[in-house]
């Protein structure tokens, strides 16, 4: 290796598009790579949310025109091979122009042509799968990738190149104090149990409509913090209007500081997206997961089982969310010792060093 090659910073091209679940873990890794002196670029789609999320991140974006074909019409499926070929050549052109040394794919359809382009150019590929069930693109790329990272164990068949890393999460989540200390401190201070309901930025209509009637049946004094989405505030507030005196309820359109919300919660009720499950484990919070029933391959149930199978969480399928079932579940969970034990188990199964682990694997390629 020449002196000029030794002095050239490693150039890593990130590939992630479509949803925050793909983009945020990739961004955490990208920022860490930059801090270690790497040059980072990003392969994106022209209209994906990644363009907005990367706007102020000092990461150059290179776009290829690609869309998903899964479940779409016949004409789009027939045109798909030509679109994939065109997108692959576009990605190859960028990679040669930028002299890319390694490629890291985090999902989204952009990663398919990008991974194929890297393979054709002899550039090593790392992929990272956030969910417990591999998405279509990552399932295909796992055959050609040099390193396959999985957030949850056994997502891919056992192999020397498969590494269970966990999902990269934000520093403010990994910095949350231990669950045992937090739960014990609240008990010693005589504080009420805090129930946190999170439906995501848009809210989850099923949670907003079905949880208030069930919670109003509980006789235990509780603080309820219900994040319902901007468009559903009034409707959700109306369902709590006749709440009994033992319930103190705050209905919120969104939560700015999720680290603080996790830290103060005794029980969280939420969907089971990959990053949500990861953050719940990292924070160390007892959880009731309500998997999104329309999630592809029911991957949210698989995500939730990661914590439910070790006693750190309960799973309540949306189809079974009757007032009677919910009341029985919540009555069982209104036990501070049980919630503390669940929270401790959640933290025990967290992988707070996931970001650095993935970065190290990229650096070694």
Swiss-Prot record:
It is an enzyme of class 2 (transferase). Gene3D superfamilies: Glycogen Phosphorylase B (3.40.50.2000). Signal peptide: none annotated. UDP-N-acetyl-alpha-D-glucosamine binds at residues 19-21, 131, 170, 201, 255, 274-279, 300. One of its GO terms (biological process) is carbohydrate metabolic process. InterPro entries: GlcNAc_MurG, Glyco_trans_28_C, GlycoTrans_28_N. It is a peripheral membrane protein. Keywords: Cell cycle, Cell division, Cell inner membrane, Cell membrane, Cell shape, Cell wall biogenesis/degradation, Glycosyltransferase, Membrane, Peptidoglycan synthesis, Transferase. Pathway: Cell wall biogenesis; peptidoglycan biosynthesis. GO terms for cellular component: plasma membrane. Its EC number is 2.4.1.227. Disulfide bonds: none annotated. Cell wall formation. Catalyzes the transfer of a GlcNAc subunit on undecaprenyl-pyrophosphoryl-MurNAc-pentapeptide (lipid intermediate I) to form undecaprenyl-pyrophosphoryl-MurNAc-(pentapeptide)GlcNAc (lipid intermediate II). Belongs to the glycosyltransferase 28 family. MurG subfamily. This is UDP-N-acetylglucosamine--N-acetylmuramyl-(pentapeptide) pyrophosphoryl-undecaprenol N-acetylglucosamine transferase. It comes from Acinetobacter baumannii (strain ACICU). The lineage of its organism: Bacteria, Pseudomonadati, Pseudomonadota, Gammaproteobacteria, Moraxellales.
């Amino acid at each position: 290796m020449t002196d000029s090659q030794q002095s050239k910073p490693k150039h890593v091209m990130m590939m992630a598009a479509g949803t925050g679940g793909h983009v945020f873990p990739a961004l955490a890794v990208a920022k860490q790579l930059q801090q270690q002196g790497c040059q980072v670029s990003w392969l994106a789609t022209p209209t994906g949310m990644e363009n907005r999320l990367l706007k102020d991140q000092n990461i150059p974006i290179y776009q290829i025109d690609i869309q998903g074909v899964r479940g779409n019409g016949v004409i789009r499926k027939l045109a798909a091979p030509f679109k994939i070929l065109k997108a692959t050549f576009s990605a190859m052109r960028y990679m040669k122009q930028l002299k890319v040394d390694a490629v890291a794919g985090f999902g989204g359809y952009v990663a398919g042509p990008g991974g194929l382009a890297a393979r054709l150019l002899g550039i090593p590929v790392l992929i990272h799968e956030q969910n417990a069930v591999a998405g279509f693109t990552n399932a295909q790329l796992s055959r050609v990738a040099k390193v396959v990272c999985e957030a949850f164990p056994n997502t891919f068949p056992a192999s020397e190149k498969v590494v269970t890393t966990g999902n990269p999460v934000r520093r403010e989540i990994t910095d949350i104090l231990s669950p045992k200390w937090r739960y014990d401190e609240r008990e010693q201070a005589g504080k009420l149990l805090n129930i946190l309901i999170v439906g995501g930025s848009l809210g989850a209509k099923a949670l907003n409509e079905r949880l208030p009637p069930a919670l109003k049946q509980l006789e235990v004094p509780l603080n309820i913090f219900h994040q319902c989405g901007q468009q559903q505030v009034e409707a959700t507030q109306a369902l709590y209007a006749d709440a009994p005196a033992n319930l103190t309820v705050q209905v919120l359109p969104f939560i700015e500081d999720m680290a603080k919300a996790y830290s103060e919660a005794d029980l969280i009720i939420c969907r089971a997206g990959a990053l949500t499950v990861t953050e719940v484990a990292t924070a160390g919070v007892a959880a009731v997961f309500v998997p999104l029933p329309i999630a592809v391959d029911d991957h949210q149930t698989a995500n939730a089982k990661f914590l439910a199978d070790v006693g750190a969480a309960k799973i309540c399928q949306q189809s079974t969310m009757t007032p009677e079932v919910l009341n029985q579940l919540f009555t069982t969970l209104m036990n501070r010792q049980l919630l503390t034990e669940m929270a401790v188990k959640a933290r025990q199964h967290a992988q707070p060093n996931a970001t650095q682990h993935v970065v190290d694997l990229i650096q070694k390629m």
